[in-house]
Amino acid sequence: MKVFMIGGTGLLGSEAAKCLIEKGHEVETLSLPSLPKGAEFPKEMKIVFGDINKMTDAEIEAQLKGVDVFVFAAGVDERVECPAPVEAFYYKYNIAPLERVFSACKRVGVKKAVVLGSYFAYLTKVRPDLQADSKHKYIRSRVLQEMVCENFADEDFAVCVLELPYIFGTQKGRKPVWTILIEQIEFMDKFPFTMYPKGGTAMLTCRQVGQVIAGACEKEYKGFNAVPIGMYNMKWDKFLSVVYKARGMDPQIKIVGVPAWMMQMGMVKAVKDYKKRGIASGVNPMQLPHIMNYDLFIDNKYAIELGATEDDINSAIEDSIRVSVAAYEGKAELLGMLGEE
């Protein structure tokens, strides 16, 4: 099987490439020119440097000829800060490439696509009462992304969206997206306790994501499929204990679960900061507490069905946090996301 990826040199794409190559498949990826310093990629993976947003339709078609599966392992999430209008930013990186590549896929006969999506789209299905897609522009963009995938899917072109939760693990030379968490919680270090929402989240490691992507490439899908993915469900208080341990702090620091209205009071500072810096947030800070007070958990059966195996999630969290702290403190020269996951 020949697989063409966008984002194969990113944290998640490179893990998928490793798994696919180990399974005997051929992998080629389109990558932005800047590669993380020291990162290792499978020598069997062919890397083509370029920007999908600057390629012609003919160039895209040439890349897709003879390909069995297209994997979109690129894009940006809600933790990437961007200027207004945020809707245009998300469209450029998360949706527009799919519209162009899917059209080319159908013209040259590619039969399947696997897209790395977000579990926030899954949230809108299990908790429509939260109205997350109307209150948060990032979540709306992920719902629109799935709509585009569904519109292109048919009996001759299958599309599988992997609704991914929070992911932990590191890639040498690349800046983790978790630096934003360090910024958010550092001010509470001086207190004898930490106030945080009562909810929790699904999660998995980057290695497990690679396994799931490879499994989705191999699985026989028909039409459109959206699959919620997660291997572990963790409450926020337990998660923060692991974070504190990674930061060299006492993991037994008391963590007090607070209601949404109380967290909203703390978000006023974030709103003012965004406004001062001209940043448009894809997630409404004043509405986020309602999501974080919910246990956004996922049954791991879907990930296991696609080949995910056990991993050490606590170690992956600790690795992510240690590198994030180094980046936040300016002690490491790391490459940002650049639209690749």
Give the label of every model feature segment.
Residues V3-K23:
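N-terminal Rossmann NAD(P)H-binding glycine-rich loop of SDR-like oxidoreductase domains
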Residues K46-A96, R100:
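NAD(P)H-binding glycine-rich loop region in Rossmannoid oxidoreductase-like domains
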Residues A96-R140, C160:
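Conserved Rossmann-fold NAD(P)-dependent oxidoreductase catalytic core, especially the SDR/UDP-sugar
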Residues V148-G173:
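Conserved beta-loop-beta element that borders a ligand/cofactor-binding pocket
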Residues G169-I182, A216-V227, M249-P251:
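Glycine/proline-rich active-site loop of Rossmann-fold NAD(P)-dependent oxidoreductases
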Residues E183-L204:
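A conserved pocket-lining segment of Rossmann-fold NAD(P)-dependent short-chain dehydrogenase/reductase
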Residues L240-L296:
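Terminal hydrophobic/aromatic helix or amphipathic segment near a protein terminus
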Residues Y294-E341:
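Amphipathic terminal alpha-helices
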